[in-house]
From Swiss-Prot:
Monomer. ATP binds at L11, S12, G13, K14, S15, T16, R119. This is Shikimate kinase. GO terms for biological process: amino acid biosynthetic process; aromatic amino acid family biosynthetic process; chorismate biosynthetic process. It is found in: Cytoplasm. The lineage of its organism: Bacteria, Bacillati, Bacillota, Clostridia, Eubacteriales. Belongs to the shikimate kinase family. Substrate binds at D33, R57, G79, R137. Keywords: Amino-acid biosynthesis, Aromatic amino acid biosynthesis, ATP-binding, Cytoplasm, Kinase, Magnesium, Metal-binding, Nucleotide-binding, Transferase. Its cofactor is Mg(2+).
Length: 170
């Protein structure tokens, strides 16, 4: 499949870079969290509160299975999607996976800068929780096809496009 799949921690820039990549490549953008919100007619926060995290992860898995038939998409995943059910391996079947790596210190700055009420796992700007999440997830994220240090927006876009074209053999 010829898709780009963006993975990484919450606040790593997946949605922002995804929008720009989709414009550059003229691919449709699929944001898995937004898709789930539309399917459920509820916010992610409400879904977690009413049904719990396991229910949410089941919805993510259904989306992955639907995306296996798609091409020419930029897919921005929720931060936990690659982690659960060994989904990283399923994502690699869907397309070119890109881990947007952001240093923990930068993620903490981004979290503290704004209040992220919509993100159920980042409630109360808990830096210790974010640090623990980072440590638990990094090894799985690093299984992506390529790793981009996403601290410079324009450089990240250029690097992703180049790596994707190389992967495709262009």
């Amino acid at each position: 499949m010829e898709n780009i799949v963006l993975i990484g921690m919450p606040l790593s820039g997946k949605s922002t870079l995804g929008r720009e990549l989709s414009k550059i490549l003229k691919y449709d953008l699929i944001d898995t969290d937004t898709l789930i919100e539309e399917m459920e007619d509820k916010s992610i926060k409400e879904i977690f509160k009413i049904y719990g995290e396991d229910y949410f992860r089941e919805k993510e898995l259904k989306i992955i299975n639907k995306l296996k038939k798609e091409s020419n998409k930029v897919i921005s995943t929720g931060g936990g999607l690659p982690i659960y059910n060994k989904n990283i391996y399923e994502l690699k079947k869907i397309g070119f996976t890109v881990y947007l790596k952001v240093p923990l210190e930068e993620l903490i700055k981004r979290m503290v800068k704004k209040e992220y009420d919509t993100r159920p796992l980042l409630k109360n700007n808990d830096t210790k929780f974010l640090e623990e999440m980072y440590k638990n997830r990094i090894e799985i994220y690093e299984k992506a096809h390529t790793i981009i240090c996403n601290t410079n927006y324009k450089e990240s876009l250029i690097t992703i496009v180049r790596a994707y074209k190389k992967w495709k053999g262009i």
